[in-house]
């Protein structure tokens, strides 16, 4: 069972919308495989999309799942672990999983969902405290970091691939998610804050270019390595929301080139943290989804199932052009081809 995580240390990069389309497209192209989507984000936007989106009751369906006993979400599972943080309790992970296709007919039936939950923010302080508790003979931090790993270990033979979407922060629940991932997909935008965010991401995950050596002892990478655990590798840099205005001479292109240059320098210095040896092999350009994306996400619909022509969305009449929709499908396929 292999796992990919969509993450960057910045919001607004289109991470969740990209994750939604990639997960659905991968599942559709690989109907013989079982896919598990894990939403480790308090906003739970990926879960809402998979469960129906704005116009098809995604929020209502998610609240219904969170209202079950036990609470059918990642927050419900963490709630189970809080009284038993250092020993795996007797439980079935199936109690916390959802089949999105039962709520949203647009979603392939080979996808299961570990839904997101706003409880994560409330639980974060308690989880942090437990992870930093000193108990002789117990590595409490690693034991807590393994919570998601403990859960999916039960169904390891039942899934072929796991996709994880996580909050842009580097909170404890994000670290729990990162420790579970084998590969990272880093979405970036054509702005300087994305460049800083990707630099921050490499510092936070791999402990690179820390401002002082005093931080290295407490770094995520240091703690995982001390436990003889491997770090996830960067697999794809996704240049997201590329438009026709981002030609070679544009300011946007200059920012994206600077990001590529930073990554290229890191490949030379730390080749072991990448799955590619040349930056061009790891970069994927994703065109801006425009109206097609707005409509698809409102309906909780993958692009390949998105009808074209005039559609009604929340009382408004909008038009989706067939060629635009097809270009969106092609853009997602360029990323899925690399998985």
Specify the residue positions occupied by each region the protein language model found.
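Conserved catalytic-core segment of NTP-binding enzymes
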Residues: 2-4, 29-31, 142-269
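C-terminal lobe/tail of nucleotide-utilizing enzymes
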Residues: 218-339
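Extended hydrophobic secondary-structure segments that form protein cores and membrane-embedded regions
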Residues: 36-41, 112-116, 164-165, 234-240
